[in-house]
């Protein structure tokens, strides 16, 4: 196989002040892909809710911060337990029990009360009701 072309440092044609450009040494040669191009790894994107959690925190308590560990815990609560999926599934079951084909805010509210424990459910319901009221008033 033919060796790769030697790369030269790109500093915009200028060397840093007081230093001469240094040539890179060829330590370990790697072979190129058969097509002559390097294969790029696609970075898998992780879905996180960190920015949304932070925005809600700032709306509720503007002067309060959150540590990375606490953010990680809240993020895992939302993503790994699939809380949205659980609420939707429970709301679907409630609609089916009542022989209705539409999931309304009432089914969502009841499913949140069933899934989330105690005080957390109360806060979630009150914030959800507030959000629905705000949305309803803005669309008129």
Swiss-Prot record:
Position(s), cross-link Glycyl lysine isopeptide (Lys-Gly) (interchain with G-Cter in ubiquitin):
134
Q: Which InterPro entries does this UniProt record tie to the protein? A: Histone-fold (IPR009072), Histone_H2A/H2B/H3 (IPR007125), Histone_H2B (IPR000558), HISTONE_H2B_site (IPR055333)
- Disordered: where is this region? 1-47
Residue positions, PTM N6-acetyllysine: 7, 14, 24
Per UniProt, location of the Glycyl lysine isopeptide (Lys-Gly) (interchain with G-Cter in SUMO) cross-link in this chain: 7, 24-25
Cite the PANTHER family for this sequence: HISTONE H2B
Query: Which family would the database say this protein is a member of?
Result: Belongs to the histone H2B family.
Protein name in the entry: Histone H2B
The protein's organism comes out as Phaeosphaeria nodorum (strain SN15 / ATCC MYA-4574 / FGSC 10173) (Glume blotch fungus)
> Lineage in the entry?
Eukaryota, Fungi, Dikarya, Ascomycota, Pezizomycotina
């Amino acid at each position: 196989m033919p060796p790769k072309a030697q790369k030269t440092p790109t500093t915009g044609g200028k060397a840093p002040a007081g230093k001469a450009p240094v040539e890179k040494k060829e330590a370990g040669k790697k072979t190129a892909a058969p097509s002559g191009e390097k294969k790029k790894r696609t970075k898998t994107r992780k879905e996180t809710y960190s920015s949304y959690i932070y925005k809600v925190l700032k709306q509720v308590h503007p002067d309060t911060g959150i540590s990375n560990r606490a953010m990680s815990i809240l993020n895992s609560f939302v993503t790994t337990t699939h809380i949205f999926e659980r609420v939707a599934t429970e709301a679907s079951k409630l609609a089916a029990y009542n022989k209705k084909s539409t999931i309304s805010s009432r089914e969502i509210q009841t499913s949140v009360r069933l899934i989330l424990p105690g005080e957390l459910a109360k806060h979630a319901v009150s914030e959800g009701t507030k959000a629905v009221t705000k949305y309803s008033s803005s669309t008129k």
